[in-house]
Amino acid sequence: MARTEVYNKKKNRTTSLIVFSLAFLFILSSIGFWVVYPFPSDEKVPYFTEDYTMIFEEDIFNKQAMFSNQLYIPYTFIKQHIDSSIQFDEESSSVIMTTDQKVYQMPSDSLNYYMNNSKQKLSFPVLKQENGNLYLASEWLQKVYPMEIRYFKDTKAVQILEHDQILQKATMRATEDEDLRRMRTSPTLTSPYVAELSEGVELFIEKDTKEYFKVRTENGVAGYLKKSVVQLNGTDRIKAEVQANKIPFKPSIEWPVHVTWDGIYQASANPTSQPDLEGVKVLSPTWFELQNGEGDIRNIASKSYVDQAHEKGYRVWALFSNAFEPDRTQKALSTYESRQKMIKQLLQYAEIYNLDGLNLDFENVYEQDGPKLTQFARELTPLAHEAGLVVSMDITFISESAMWSKFYEREELADAVDYLMVMAYDEHWGSSQVAGSVSSLPWVKRNLNQLLQVVPHDRLILGVPLYTRLWKIEQGENGKKVSSESFTMEEAEKWMKERDLESKYDRSTGQDYVEYQVPDKSITYKMWLENKTSLAKRAQLVHQFQLAGIATWSKYFADDEAWKTLDEELSHRKIVQKSE
């Protein structure tokens, strides 16, 4: 082969390699340029795909409003995003809504509604039903909820804004670049756009990203704009027709509260006179009991009891019990009508007997009925406050027991009533097969710490037992048999004295403890005492946990020293050693 031919082949190969390399570099640089400087999208997409779309907290919701002579908002939207406590009562075909001062009932498709059982008239229905869906009139909603509802006629969209919400105002700057005038669906020029804006268009800033603002126009359309074309112009604050501030009901009673329950189960058992109970401020007689599922209430109250109590300076918060009957309770709580029947009776009794408050004692309730019990409290409290009554409710510590603990919606109940009274006893029930304290101090503290995670300390009253249990443990051929009986303080002292026994302090429970072995028999008695030692510690928990006070169960079990001890300890805070 000639040298010239070889040289030409090498030259052609080199030229091809150079051309290929240049082409590759051009393609690579073009791709890189496109990545760094992408072509803006010219695709326009609709922001609203349906009429009456809801806008709330920057988000769009599929639940649509309805226009029927005026704007209506879906009930389901209000319940999920504005007021979780609003209820629909199927039997009366009404929506029930409560505030701290009012109870509203809105019958479906009616020009009348009820506020605290007083009929109100409107020129439009507050509640409408359409195709199986419920809707509430926006005009009425703005009179009871702290919010502003805006309707944009040109886009047929609805925006809900909350009272005191701050809106960052802005305007569109002038720009010749068409692509920068377009609001994008995401913070990039390659995304589709929903609208093209002109200079001076007023905007509200909803989100600040790295290079973009998410903005919303005055007709509800939202999208992303480059920060360079947005001029910030100060802020607006939403001022709703109704303010968000809750007006608390303040009972005219000094801190710390000391309530004592007065166990009365027959009308004939009402005392004819009231003793002097040192430090006690409130008596709570067990007078009212749910009689049946229709909501009738058994009443054994006494006007002379209240009159004498008032003369002694006591307030009277009468107790209303569900009789611990779950089926009866379920039926009575199931409808607005039956709940109102109970409420009307209680308010009538409160007026007749000149009561100062009501104490709700619902126990042994099906777990699924817990929300209905909460609703009952919500519906009772505003009407009770209107009558000048304090509302308290008894609860247990948090546990896994469905019918004695889990049905209590403690956080919601704390918001519905004035005080929650935690029954801090029955650590060991009377039927327990393990002998133990009614309420050991470490058990109380541990459970208080847990409960105070969901209940405000200044709304919580600590239940204090004034009774003890005498435990009898018998060893027999068939094993161990455990039984108990309740003792008053005086009965416990008498039992010890008859056997010449002295108690010893039990550090593990924070109580005095006594044990007795029956001679020549396989019988042992054990008793964890409620006396000056334990009561002083319990009263100091009010200071330690900054609680509202105590409620003692019950007046019948106490001796004179108990009242004196509790009063002294509630009046003075002590420095508690860690070992205690």
What do these predicted ranges mean?
Residues 219-230:
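A short macromolecule-binding patch
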